[in-house]
Amino acid sequence: LRDDVPVTNPNVICFGKPGRGKSATTKAFILRMMDFGYRTLILGDPKDEYEPLCTVLGVEPFRIGPGLPARINPLAFGPLAQGWEHLDAGEAQARAAIVFGRWLTLLRGLVGSQRVGETPVPFGPVEENVVKAGLRLLTGYTHGNTHLVETTIPALWHLLNSPTPELVEQCRYASTRHFLDETRLLRDALGQLTSGALAGLFDDHTSITVDWSAPIQSLSLSRLEPLGDEAVGIALTCLSSWGRGMRE
């Protein structure tokens, strides 16, 4: 390692052929880093590989699946919303750029996971502008509220399905009919997600309380296996965005 090169964004990638010990290496790394005060957050465990490790450390994983009580809101603000009423304009804009940027990345991935035949649903500058305007209205950022309101993906879908005159104007559409015609694919994709892969899992405010002082916390996705790879992939996308928000 070169001491003259600062590490500002440390990441580790573990990859290899099946059965070569990737999971075992990761678990060993996790355990050893605990001696140095590091804690671990498993953002989606599709096969419950980390459950035995959690059990040894006295931690019960959060189980996410159809019919289970756990909900995760991928549009949660996280710590960046704390003390919003005390921020000056520059800091508020900087934090908003981070939060809305994270949400747009999430929704771009979710909408793009839906298909029309073999073609992914597009999420270009027009769709991004509509979604961003909708999120800003729902949270109160558009009106400069001192306390922002946490929203959800279903709430965004409902707003786009029944747009307010303000939203139509901000998105530069001639009329509500024009707005609805031009955003049909976007709205249908969000509607399909809301009633399908996200339903009962990522469609409401977060209902779990993470113990950040625990040595490890894990979110189990093994109950999603019968739903197929697409459902697991969407869940991992949502958890990645939520986890990023909790750490920002």
Each model region followed by its residue ranges:
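P-loop NTPase motor domains
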Residues: 55-58, 75-248
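Glycine-rich phosphate-binding loop of nucleotide-binding enzymes
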Residues: 1-66
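Short active-site-adjacent structural elements
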Residues: 72
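Conserved phosphoryl-transfer catalytic core
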Residues: 69
